């Protein structure tokens, strides 16, 4: 009946609001190829709010890429949309969460210098410009190294004699870059490590 349905819905809403106010939540943000999604779950893993941001990579100078501004704006946009959803559903302002996780494209090439400057535009997983490197690495390791893997991009840059290679301090994936942007720490998750090499 309508009364029990309304009561059940109100109870669930009250539990979600309590979880938000007590930081009994986890926020996951996923950088997909065309959309960045933010999902807030409670301590029982129930989705309680979400937000998203549409984005699209561009083909510039022979490379599929997103700019650092695209990444920052997308992160902010998806989070802002989530905050709005929380406010509309529960009437509270989201100011903190219990845990945060980032997921993003595990392949690609983002080399940085010692000062933290990106040396070349982010080369996404869509690029298939590393055929020579991929073949040579396959021969060397007797293991398939797909063109999208970061090591193939790095080795191709070396084979091409690209100027930036001498200035590389570290390289990372998009997920690791977002993690560093948020925390200041250089961390690479196990899934991303598999995509680098």
Named regions from a protein language model:
Residues 2-120, 135-136, 165-167:
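N-terminal glycine/serine-rich phosphate-binding loop of ATP-dependent small-molecule kinases
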Residues 31-33, 102, 112, 141-197:
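Gly/Ser/Thr-rich active-site cleft segment
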Residues 53, 123-124, 192:
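Residue-level structural signal for beta-strand termini and adjacent loop
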Residues 68-71, 75, 130, 150-153:
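Conserved donor sugar-nucleotide recognition element shared by glycan-biosynthetic enzymes
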Residues 121, 133, 181:
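Residues that scaffold the ATP/ADP-binding catalytic core of kinase and kinase-like folds
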Residues 127:
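Carbohydrate-associated surface elements
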Residues 134-137, 157:
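Hydrophobic packing residues within well-ordered alpha-helices of enzyme cores
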């Amino acid at each position: 009946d309508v009364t029990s349905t309304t009561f059940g819905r109100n109870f669930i809403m009250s539990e979600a609001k309590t979880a938000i106010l007590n930081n009994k939540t986890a926020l996951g943000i996923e950088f997909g190829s065309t959309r960045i999604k933010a999902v807030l779950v409670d301590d029982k893993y129930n989705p309680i709010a979400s937000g998203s941001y549409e984005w699209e990579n561009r083909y510039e100078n022979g490379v599929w890429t997103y700019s650092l501004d695209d990444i920052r704006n997308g992160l902010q946009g998806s989070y802002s949309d989530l905050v709005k959803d929380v406010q509309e559903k529960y009437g509270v302002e989201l100011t903190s969460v219990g845990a945060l996780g980032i997921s993003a494209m595990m392949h690609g090439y983002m080399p940085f210098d010692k000062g933290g400057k990106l040396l070349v535009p982010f080369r996404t997983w869509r690029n298939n410009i590393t055929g020579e490197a991929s073949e040579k690495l396959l021969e060397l390791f007797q293991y398939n190294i797909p063109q999208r893997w970061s090591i193939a991009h790095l080795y191709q840059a070396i084979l091409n004699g690209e100027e930036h290679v001498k200035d590389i301090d570290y390289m990372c994936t998009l997920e690791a870059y977002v993690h560093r942007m948020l925390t200041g720490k250089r961390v690479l998750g196990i899934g991303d490590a598999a995509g680098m090499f």
